[in-house]
Regions:
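Core segments of cupin and vicinal oxygen chelate
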Residues: 86-137
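N-terminal beta-strand motif that seeds the catalytic metal site of vicinal oxygen chelate
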Residues: 1-2, 58-93, 105-107, 148-155, ...
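A compositional/structural signature marking long, glycine- and acidic/polar-rich segments
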Residues: 119-185
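Residue-level signal for secondary-structure boundary sites
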Residues: 10-12, 138, 163, 202, ...
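A structural feature that tracks compact, well-ordered secondary-structure segments
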Residues: 1-3, 54-56, 96-99, 107, ...
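Vicinal oxygen chelate
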Residues: 1-77, 80-89, 116, 128-130, 145-171, 174-234, ...
Length: 234
């Protein structure tokens, strides 16, 4: 389940009405769920591929900053927690749903051979990158089934040294590396990928791009990365 924050009660009510108009069923959060998440209101719904999302407002903020055991500072604030890549079955319908129903903005695209996701040879499928805040993308989708309902999640820190130290800990503890250190082409992030116990990948990186929607033009990337990111490599 992935949560998305809206401004206030009026914004959440507008989202309810928009979901109803689009024929998307949703349910209200229970008092226990509101207390657990420390929010004032939330609604929960599923996309056409059974990925679960929540919209909420009125989150309770701590007055003390989070200090991790390794003193890494995460890049959050108006960029949100990071990004998530979810599995879908139809990339055309997914683009329509996330942009027209949920209001995400297309930031970038990348085409892949259809056989990469089990489709007929010679066909093409699209990996799309969508945004709702200054972060280059907060949501992306890949037209490929995934039992965990998550392809990967990304967390960003503000220093390259913290990425390097995290990579050293991954190797020290024998966690399976899914992709080596590299710099992505679309959001320019320097990162690596590690396999989580839940079966999805965790991307850990720094130096991600931010965008200004008044000037941004959606693009197509022709490669995953400028360098590195050897998937399956150690």
């Amino acid at each position: 389940c992935t949560g998305w924050e809206v401004a206030d009660h009026q914004a959440l009510q507008a989202a309810r009405e928009h979901l109803q108009k689009a024929g998307v069923e949703f349910e209200e959060g229970t008092p226990g769920e509101l207390a657990e998440r420390r929010v004032q209101e939330l609604v929960r719904f599923r996309d056409p591929w059974d990925n679960v999302f929540e919209l909420y407002h009125g989150i309770t903020y701590e007055s003390r900053p989070v200090v991790t055991p390794y003193a890494a500072k995460f890049v959050t604030g108006d960029q949100g927690l990071g990004h998530i890549v979810v599995p879908v079955l139809d990339d055309v319908e997914a683009l329509r749903f996330y942009t027209e129903v949920l209001g995400f903005r297309l930031r970038d695209s990348m085409s892949m051979p259809g056989e990469f996701v089990g489709k007929e040879p010679g066909s093409k499928v699209w990996l799309r990158f969508l945004g709702v805040n200054p972060r280059h993308h907060s949501l992306a989708f890949l037209p490929m089934p995934n039992p965990s309902k998550c392809v990967h999640v990304m967390f960003e820190v503000d220093k390259l040294d913290d990425v390097g130290r995290a990579l050293e800990r991954v190797r020290k503890h024998g966690a399976p590396l899914s992709a080596t250190l590299g710099r992505h082409m679309n959001d320019e992030m320097i990162s690596f990928y590690v396999k989580s116990p839940g079966g999805f990948d965790v991307e850990f990186g720094t130096d991600g791009m931010t965008v200004d929607d008044s000037k941004w033009v959606a693009r197509e990337s022709t490669a995953v990365s400028y360098w590195g990111h050897v998937f399956g490599g150690q």
